Amino acid sequence: METHSELWSLEAIKEVYNTPIFELIHRANAILRSNFPHSELQTCYLVSIKTGGCTEDCAYCAQSSRYQTHVKPEPMMKITEVLDRAKQAIRAGATRVCLGAAWREVKDNHQFDRTLEMIKGITDMGAEVCCTLGMLTPSQAEKLFEAGLYAYNHNLDSSEGFYKTIITTRKYEDRLRTLDIVEKSGLHVCCGGIIGMGETVEDRVELLHNLARRERMPESVPVNVLWPIKGTPLYDQASISFWEILRTIATARIVFPQSMVRLAAGRAFLSVEQQTLCFIAGANSIFYGEKLLTVDNNDMDADTAMLNLLGMRHRPSFSMERGQPCQSVTC
């Protein structure tokens, strides 16, 4: 039997991406329905526990200290503040809480200790917790696991070739090494990328191929659409079409049949009808709440109304145990 990496060559993924749109959506929807309960949507709430002041030069990011944007460095949030926001989000229907910090890497200090306490507190509320904190060591990953962390987010962003044009302060190999550490710790991997940065279709295909070559499939694959922010190098980047977004979502669903495919940043650009097409084509996770780190997101009440309109229900927390790898299947 072919392994997942053998099955999904660059050529095979590109062929899927370029499939006629009706056939592509039909295939992706069939795979979604065969692997997940019908009409179930994961709702994630994102909290920026440390905003701004990042030393990296990611061309898309408002939190870089190298650019003059609307974002100013803020002190790290207090534990009680984060727990209060998490509690409100869970009451509103969120089943995963994601904690983000504008760090290049995790440091063994009081801020990391505070993050561990946040994880413990939110886990005790019955929600999954995901963190995106930058690069980390094996011992730090172990501490996160012991604190109850469910998943760790570390995106590849794009293909290795295109990556070099948007980030110079961190190598692609550094990101792959971080994913290795997360996988070995027993934590679930949340890893995807950003589209609409000026990359080609080949770059998007290579991003998915790099993920498909991993020993374990990611638990979540977030698909972010660039939100151009004034002051960043990509502010004047032309928008991509909705059909490119839809093709990326559907291709990700086909390549990663048992992973959550998250319609992440940029969703606020899409109408309810466009979002519905993305759900039909394989997206089964969204960020729930008015803010995604530094950019706007859909209003929570509007999202609740959309879910009710579509007859969708919230995916329960801990539908997959920690340490349980996502098994690839041939589709």
Curated annotation (Swiss-Prot):
Binding site for [4Fe-4S] cluster: 54, 58, 61
Catalytic reactions on record: (4R,5S)-dethiobiotin + (sulfur carrier)-SH + 2 reduced [2Fe-2S]-[ferredoxin] + 2 S-adenosyl-L-methionine = (sulfur carrier)-H + biotin + 2 5'-deoxyadenosine + 2 L-methionine + 2 oxidized [2Fe-2S]-[ferredoxin]
Pathway membership, UniProt: Cofactor biosynthesis; biotin biosynthesis; biotin from 7,8-diaminononanoate: step 2/2
GO molecular function: 2 iron, 2 sulfur cluster binding; 4 iron, 4 sulfur cluster binding; biotin synthase activity; iron ion binding
Binding sites annotated in the UniProt record for [2Fe-2S] cluster: 98, 130, 190, 262
Gene Ontology BP term (one): biotin biosynthetic process
Record-linked InterPro entries: Aldolase_TIM, BATS_dom, Biotin_synth/BioAB, Biotin_synthase, Elp3/MiaA/NifB-like_rSAM, rSAM
Pfam family, one: BATS
Domain Radical SAM core: 39-264
The protein's enzyme class: transferase
EC number, UniProt record: 2.8.1.6
Cofactor: binding details: Binds 1 [4Fe-4S] cluster. The cluster is coordinated with 3 cysteines and an exchangeable S-adenosyl-L-methionine.
CC cofactor: [4Fe-4S] cluster; [2Fe-2S] cluster
Key words, A-Z: 2Fe-2S, 4Fe-4S, Biotin biosynthesis, Iron, Iron-sulfur, Metal-binding, S-adenosyl-L-methionine, Transferase
Function description: Catalyzes the conversion of dethiobiotin (DTB) to biotin by the insertion of a sulfur atom into dethiobiotin via a radical-based mechanism.
Subunit structure: Homodimer.
Family assignment from sequence similarity: Belongs to the radical SAM superfamily. Biotin synthase family.
Record-given protein name: Biotin synthase
Organism of provenance: Chlamydia abortus (strain DSM 27085 / S26/3) (Chlamydophila abortus)
Gene: bioB
